């Protein structure tokens, strides 16, 4: 990344044209000065990558897209990054469909809002190559209700709202199956849809809605499967959830949340530094506390994340 261009006021007035031997001297000095400036620009570009910005003091600004800007862990990570000369600028998105296109179009430098399965679906659907550069946590996907206090209280033919994006929808169906509320044909998979529900063998009916609207749907349904960030933003108490999947199990691998970059920036040292800072004790504790203790920290090598992503992309392509 090159430094921002200077304005016209920064260009010094040219002296009278020199004569004689001074011409060669001035030319040599000018060439040397240009060489130094070019070398500095190349160094800054190497350190900051193609999207972030470096100021005159060498501080780097990195734009990170998220859907949970209000989470209490962000100030902790932002302060820690600032100590390393990295100024994090958060860009909040109101739903899950916006942050990956924004990253691909270089409107932001990184994003942190999604798990690997969501990323796999995006890459396949959009023929994209966004890639994980660091893991963070796995959070449960839980069932909440304003009308019932236990799964057993949900009546036959009760209505359950679930997220309608493919990855969270499939996970929600698996959660409901684990809770004994429905059955999926063939046992279901990470790509299950409402069409896979065995209605004759199921107790409830599902209603897909936008993930951001699952909380708002609570008064009109028996229960809703709600993503952790939306549940916390709505001040729902995770301990009052009727049911949730177990983020510590191996089956949770597709749901590892990750920092994501463009493929060209996957080795950017500034971006990788931010991903590493997440696992410092103070930052990690803040993230887990922000989830009300529901999140499980995951620190997997990037090679593992790339392997899991490649496998999930293969599964998604096969389904299409």
List each model region and its residues.
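An extracytoplasmic/periplasmic, membrane-proximal ligand-sensing/linker region
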Residues: 59-62, 69-73, 221, 279-320
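Ligand-binding "clamshell"
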Residues: 121-133, 148, 220, 225, ...
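Immediate post-signal peptide segment of exported/extracytoplasmic ligand-binding proteins
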Residues: 45-63, 81-82, 151-157, 313-320
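Terminal targeting segments of Actinobacterial cell-envelope proteins
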Residues: 1-25, 51-57
């Amino acid at each position: 990344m090159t430094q921002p261009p200077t304005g016209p006021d920064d260009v010094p007035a040219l002296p009278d044209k020199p004569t004689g031997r001074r011409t060669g001297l001035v030319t040599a000095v000018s060439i040397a000065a240009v060489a130094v400036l070019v070398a500095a620009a190349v160094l800054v570009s190497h350190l900051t990558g193609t999207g972030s910005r470096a100021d005159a003091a060498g501080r780097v600004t990195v734009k990170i897209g998220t859907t949970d800007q209000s989470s209490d862990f962000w100030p902790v990570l932002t302060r820690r990054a600032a100590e390393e000369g990295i100024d994090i600028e958060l860009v909040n998105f109101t739903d899950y469909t916006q942050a990956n296109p924004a990253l691909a179009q270089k409107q932001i430098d990184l994003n942190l809002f999604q798990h690997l399965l969501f990323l796999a679906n995006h890459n396949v659907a959009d023929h994209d190559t966004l890639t994980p550069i660091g893991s963070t946590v796995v959070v449960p996907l839980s069932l909440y209700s304003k009308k019932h206090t236990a799964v057993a209280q949900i009546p036959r033919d009760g209505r359950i709202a679930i997220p309608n994006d493919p990855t969270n929808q499939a996970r929600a169906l698996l959660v409901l199956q684990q809770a004994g509320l429905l059955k999926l044909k063939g046992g279901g998979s990470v790509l299950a849809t409402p069409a896979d529900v065995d209605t004759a063998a199921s107790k409830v009916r599902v209603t897909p809605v936008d993930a951001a609207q699952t909380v708002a749907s609570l008064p009109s349904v028996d229960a809703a499967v709600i993503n952790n960030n939306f549940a916390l933003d709505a001040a729902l108490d995770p301990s009052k959830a009727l049911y949730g999947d177990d983020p510590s199990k191996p089956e949770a691998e597709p749901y590892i949340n990750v920092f994501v970059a463009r493929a060209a920036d996957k080795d950017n040292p500034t971006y990788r530094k931010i991903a590493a800072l997440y696992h410092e004790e103070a930052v990690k504790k803040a993230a887990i506390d922000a989830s009300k203790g529901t999140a499980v920290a995951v620190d997997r090598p990037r090679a593992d994340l790339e392997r899991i992503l490649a496998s999930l992309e293969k599964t998604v392509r096969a389904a299409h």
